[in-house]
Amino acid sequence: CVDNARRYTRERDAALALQRNLLPHRLPEQDAVEAAACYRPADELTGLGGDWYDVIPLSGARAALVVGEVPGHGIEAAAQMGRLRTAVRTLAALGLPPDEVLAHLDDLVARGAQDQDGAGDGADGEGAEHADASQAVGAGCLYVVYDPVDGRCAMAAAGHPAPAVARPDGTVEFVDLPQGPPLGAGGPPFESAELVLPEGSVLALHTDGLLTQGDRWTLADGRERLMRALERRGTTLEPSCRGVIDALVPDRPHDDAALLMARTLRLPAGRVAEWELPVDPAAVAEARKAASRRLGAWGLEELSFTTELVVSELVTNAIRYAGGPIRLRLIRERALLVCEVHDAGATTPHLRHPRTTDEGGRGLLLVSQVTRRWGTRFVPDGKIIWAEQSLTGPET
């Protein structure tokens, strides 16, 4: 009847609007990878499913590559997918390693399911508000971090297939990645794997739907088909991504299928400068001079004043509160100048707003005012405090 048709139209319009807001309209430009993605949903009614992909720029010119899937299809699966995608982006901004990102995401899913169980016995309607939270239990996620400075690639998986890697020499293989439990299911801690990728390698992150479509073929057959498709890929990433999807996934798939392909890039050595600094207050002046000379070589003299201020404050903090060894690094990205100070400390610095009578405590406040953004990330031998400035000078 007319009412049913109108209701169908409203639901479909709402679903399509949700889809447009959940998946990235376009993948962000950054210096770590060249990326392309394709998605083919199983739900014919709405074109929606629980699979997602993402590319997230990180500090230090790095990028996070993400593919995940929520059980089920349709608008409810898509809503839970959007919740997890937002959570992953929030955790990525903290600079956490892949295994810790998945550990926090696992806790989020488990607590959401517990909240639903607790609300189910409450007043009428209260349980319905949380009813969809349990749908995220059993979700899978693959989280990869790639560093274009040294080619290191770290990754961890929660109930999700390992990515394939197509190397520049033509070989294709699947990464030997420990498989953690699905999100919210409980189990042993997540483990990370790390490898070094040559420039021009292609990572193929995918969901289960790319490898298996009902009883059409086995998982082993699907892996073999993907390897052959990657061997036949072209040089241009976007049509290659579409070609792989078309070769492996039917027009009406049994399961949602998502594919994210990323070709690794390397920053030229001339766009990275690094200095070892002694734990000596006199090193601050030398660090400022070295940074200023490097900016001159890069044609970025207009950033010398703010960069010297950032270097002075971050190096001084490292000497005063953390100790050595201390390293200063400048990275020139296409659109950003990154200043990093590495020290052996294990505590996160906090931005404070000093009173007018205070004689100190303004360092990080100044850094936050003169830079685009700043933050801290922990590494095995200490921490890195970083700050970014937007580039205005000509590219060299």
Task: Describe each PLM feature range.
Residues 338-361:
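Glycine-rich/acidic phosphate-handling loop/turn and adjacent ATP-lid/helix
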Residues 318-319:
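Short helix-loop "hinge" at the ATP-lid/N-box region of the Bergerat-fold HATPase_c
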